[in-house]
Design a protein with these regions (language model features):
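Active-site anion-handling motifs in enzyme catalytic cores
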Residues: 1-177
Length: 177
């Protein structure tokens, strides 16, 4: 409906450039918003180039707005009994090979099980994991990070929660921003 307020907080557009063929359509739909904030400066720059009728600002990602103590309130009880490391990757199957190699080496040295958290609806198991969680709820996601002994991640949010929960971690990326 046209008579409702539309607000986007800390949105991410997930691209370096907006394709020319999509600019008009994106502008049409975003112009219906009363307020838009994004979490990447590059996204702010791209959206400002569309000359929207509203101001676009960069704000802090919501994962960084709460303390560890507050996030703990939303986590479930411990879900994995033995000591473990989280393997949370948003990469492709081929890119996961490097991440898996690193995870196996660290898990062996630290004597940890490898617990995989799978991104989105993807159900492809990353080879080398001992236990897997698919389509996790926020409470499960938080619990897995809260109780992990080590984290290997490939995303901003994996890194943010590793820091927030004061975990030893390794972030491996494919060079995306």
């Amino acid at each position: 409906p046209d008579n409702v307020k539309r607000i986007a907080y800390a949105a991410s557009i997930g691209m370096e450039q907006i394709p020319d063929c999509e600019k008009m359509e994106i502008k049409k739909y975003l112009s219906k918003y009363n307020s838009i904030s994004v979490r990447e400066k590059q996204a702010e720059i791209l959206l400002k180039k569309l000359q929207l009728p509203i101001d676009v600002r960069t704000v802090l990602d919501p994962t960084l707005l709460l303390s560890k103590e507050i996030w703990n309130l939303y986590a479930l009880k411990r879900l994995v009994d033995e000591p473990y490391m989280i393997l949370y990757s948003v990469e492709t199957k081929d890119q996961n090979k490097l991440i898996t190699q690193m995870a196996k080496k660290i898990a062996k040295v630290k004597k940890l099980k490898i617990v995989g958290i799978y991104y989105g609806g993807r159900q492809q198991r990353i080879e080398g994991t001992d236990k897997n969680f698919f389509r996790v709820t926020p409470s499960v996601f938080l619990s897995l990070f809260l109780y992990a002994d080590y984290c290997i991640v490939s995303s901003f949010h994996g890194t943010a929660f590793s820091i927030n929960f004061q975990k030893n971690f390794l972030t491996i990326t494919s060079g995306r921003s």
